Regions:
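Non-catalytic interaction/Regulatory regions outside core domains
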Residues: 1-132
């Protein structure tokens, strides 16, 4: 795991603390986490080696924007989260205020229900931390 420090963001340290708390002991299966601005910039991240934080952030923001548009078009209210499942795990994207997204990557055998609960809680902490 590597931590990416974004010195330009004044709350990066506090955000990283929330991300590390979400990752915890690894029991639930969270492998990586990132806080991303709605325009696709990394606020702070704790990602696996070999994952390009900037690319991950841009793709996550794009996916969330498309999902949000689909929710609006189908008149389903406001987007809360997006789950993408693959054969080697999942990626969960959760709104963390008007201008931020929490992205979580999991193991294949992750406890998705627990991760949903923990991610929503972390997104709430990020919302407060980032003032949004």
């Amino acid at each position: 795991m590597k931590s990416q420090m974004v010195s330009e963001h004044p709350r990066a340290s506090a955000v990283r603390s929330v991300l590390r708390k979400l990752m915890g002991s690894g029991e639930a299966g969270v492998k990586a986490a990132a806080a991303i601005s709605s325009d696709g910039l990394v606020i702070a991240s704790v990602l696996q080696e070999g994952v390009d934080a900037d690319r991950f952030a841009a793709m996550s923001a794009s996916l969330l924007a498309l999902a949000d548009r689909a929710i609006v078009e189908t008149k389903r209210g406001s987007l809360k989260q997006l789950l993408i499942e693959g054969t080697n795990g999942a990626v969960l994207l959760v709104q963390a205020g008007d201008d931020a997204v929490l992205a979580v990557s999991t193991d294949p055998g992750a406890l998705i229900g627990k991760i949903f609960i923990d991610a929503r809680s972390a997104a709430g902490e990020l919302r407060v931390c980032l003032g949004g």
